[in-house]
């Protein structure tokens, strides 16, 4: 038996070859969120289990089948690794009275955990960026959040590979009415329902609309539409969202089967999808949740938010041939005792000027060090030998373009590297 440990199924390492592209996604998201006035909030990954039962929904797949939960050995509390970010963010808003002085725009980033079947684009530990806006009643913030995501896709170079799907699921009373309509319809076609749909029939019939079972698609397509059960106020809200998206030139498709997998949503729901990732094509999704804050102990507070699946955005960018690389500006080659002693102070001087430097360590011939300099991806090699040290000079050699190796003072080299 091997003594070597391996990561747990569904929990994986993000290796240095991939982190440059991850950081590009994260940095672009931070920049866009800041442009829209969202502030960062950092939340724990462990929350009370009851938070998700009440917040996400007792009869959702997340709560019924996918959460990592346990009992605290010290006090018997039921705890859960967060399966999504909205409920925890709402808990923090309520606990710290963050909306006392007015509306809040918050964002967070980090790992989430669900015990799901592992496949491409679906892991048991996955990463999300989420944004939540509290205290905004009209359709403006719904449209603005969608616009914010459209801007992010442009920044990342994938705007032409994603499609916005949009729906409205009305308010609680309209959904309750529609729920009964759906139950009656599916009862008439119960022989066509699979086991999962039969389980959902009376607990959460709207989720049947989201089934991917090919044998049920014709029946689902013919099901009554929630739009037919909407009141005037919900229709006006949805019209306001779509009108603003049209004004912004953001294309959208009405998907009347889009309901999202969490019970807290009302009115606007949306997903950004791509056809490049197979069955895991949703890269972001969200909507409005006007009753969640109150249901988790706060005052009645309108809210809207979304989550971005970072693994799927990463995979989409790779599918599109988009890469990012971390390469130093300079690789510092040093050969000889005097050069070796001077190398670290010189590397620090280069870094003080704002340059990134990979300092060769561990000795080696000039030829082997130059080979490593080339492999590092650096634009330049800064070469130190005992002769250069004696003359108080360095050699600067371009690595990515034709150019002569030049001998100069360190200050001249720093100036040249910044031009």
UniProtKB/Swiss-Prot annotation:
EC number: 6.1.1.21
Keywords in alphabetical order: Aminoacyl-tRNA synthetase, ATP-binding, Cytoplasm, Ligase, Nucleotide-binding, Protein biosynthesis
GO molecular function: ATP binding; histidine-tRNA ligase activity
Gene Ontology cellular component annotations, sorted alphabetically: cytoplasm
Catalytic activity line of the entry: tRNA(His) + L-histidine + ATP = L-histidyl-tRNA(His) + AMP + diphosphate + H(+)
One GO-annotated biological process of the protein: histidyl-tRNA aminoacylation
Subcellular location, principal: cytoplasm
Subcellular location: Cytoplasm
NCBIfam families: hisS (TIGR00442)
Record note on quaternary structure: Homodimer.
Family: Belongs to the class-II aminoacyl-tRNA synthetase family.
Protein name as annotated: Histidine--tRNA ligase
Organism from which the protein derives: Methylobacillus flagellatus (strain ATCC 51484 / DSM 6875 / VKM B-1610 / KT)
